[in-house]
Amino acid sequence: MITGKITCLHITDVRFPTSLDQHGSDAMHTDPDYSAAYVVIETDAADGLKGHGLTFTLGKGTEVVVCAVRALSRHVIGKALEDIVNNFRDFYRQLTSDGQLRWIGPEKGAVQLATAAVLNAVWDLWAKKEKKPLWKLLVDMDPHQLVSCIDFRYITDALTEEEALKILQNGKQGQRDREEHMLTSGYPAYTTSCAWLGYSDEQLKKLCSDALKEGWTRFKVKVGADLKDDIRRCELIRDMIGPDNIMMLDANQRWDVQEAISWVKDLAKYKPLWIEEPTSPDDILGHATISKELSPVNIGVATGEQCHNRVMFKQFLQAKALQYLQIDSCRLGSVNENLSVLLMAKKFNVPVCPHAGGVGLCELVQHLILFDYICVSGSLDNRMCEYVDHLHEHFTYPVIINRAAYMPPKDPGYSTEMKEESVLQYQFPDGAVWKKLILEKKVEV
């Protein structure tokens, strides 16, 4: 029995000054401060367990998401956890379909980021109650229960509830072997940490060299600011990693459609597997055009980290606008909405390669991609999960990478709990770190 009624919801603006060292920098986001709207929910249960959740931001604007979380809290406080998880679809719709709040969405923007933070905390608490890591909670669920967590509204022309159920039932075959394979070998990862756009050549060379020694074979390179510089950097990195290792490119929405096609063709000689976010994340038809034009040079299109909701993913898939689908554990409406996208990707036979470039994203998305392999896709072909080597030390249960692979978490929960001292030090603007930076005028407020 899942005990406890939610009695309070705490929300904190937590920011890390990553812009000072250009960590996370790309063609569009030149000075990001990796940040989170961090949620903690408490119940009246005797076990004292708490649910921890977050959504990822880049600094300024986190306060907007914090306000949105507070606006959603009235749908959460006073609810029994058992009632939520036994009617999860209804609870999800309560959060996303508030008759007034949905006007500033619906299911997109700051209000959807806030929804993810709240629901991530609920899922974390549920998994802790069941004494399982989140991925194992999902793997052990009956297909009917999994389907009951999903809101199929607006996507039944691409995936019906019956089709989703059949996919999950078929996924039971070989499930135990796949789970054992993950426990032994882990889920393949690629690194983005070597080639942020703001890094010097010396940094690139050292980081690539270190990564190769650690066993990394898949590398992502940020591009899009200057073509000549991109050519130089791609040549440097291709020379460093050799002809047999995999390179991907990421433009972070920098180009118009025709510009993207021309620019990427000029980089084709470096044999990138994909170009990520070549244009506006909302331009589905633009992505489709780019996909068609780059197909002859064997470069796929990857996108999804700023895809607002399952409806957009539906359209990307229907339009054949992406070859690699990148879910995000905090952009979509938490586990619930990600489940629907994983199932659509399976139906359309498109590999899922999650986005994880942000604080806490590696910790969260590892659970989703493990579930995808074990219960949905059943395949590792053309599949990998992003890894960035930043800020894991601030989490109670940090991600574990071994031989360039995500090793399945064993601790109960969604791996979302941050260390209390980190929250105190980095809360904005009153944490000790930020007070010092503001006093020294190293940052603008």
From Swiss-Prot:
It is found in: Mitochondrion. Belongs to the mandelate racemase/muconate lactonizing enzyme family. ENOSF1 subfamily. GO terms for molecular function: hydro-lyase activity; isomerase activity; L-fuconate dehydratase activity; magnesium ion binding. Substrate binds at residues 24-26, 34, 220, 252, 276, 305, 355-357, 386. The lineage of its organism: Eukaryota, Metazoa, Chordata, Craniata, Vertebrata. Its EC number is 4.2.1.68. Its cofactor is Mg(2+). GO terms for cellular component: mitochondrion. GO terms for biological process: carbohydrate catabolic process. Transmembrane segments: none annotated. It catalyses: L-fuconate = 2-dehydro-3-deoxy-L-fuconate + H2O. Keywords: Isomerase, Lyase, Magnesium, Metal-binding, Mitochondrion. Binds 1 Mg(2+) ion per subunit. SUPFAM superfamilies: Enolase C-terminal domain-like, Enolase N-terminal domain-like. It comes from Xenopus laevis (African clawed frog). InterPro entries: Enolase-like_C_sf, Enolase-like_N, Enolase_C-like, L-fuconate_dehydratase, Mandelate_racemase_C, Mandelate_racemase_N_dom, RHMD-like. This is Mitochondrial enolase superfamily member 1. Plays a role in the catabolism of L-fucose, a sugar that is part of the carbohydrates that are attached to cellular glycoproteins. Catalyzes the dehydration of L-fuconate to 2-keto-3-deoxy-L-fuconate by the abstraction of the 2-proton to generate an enediolate intermediate that is stabilized by the magnesium ion. May down-regulate thymidylate synthase activity, possibly already at the RNA level, by promoting the degradation of TYMS mRNA via an antisense RNA-based mechanism.
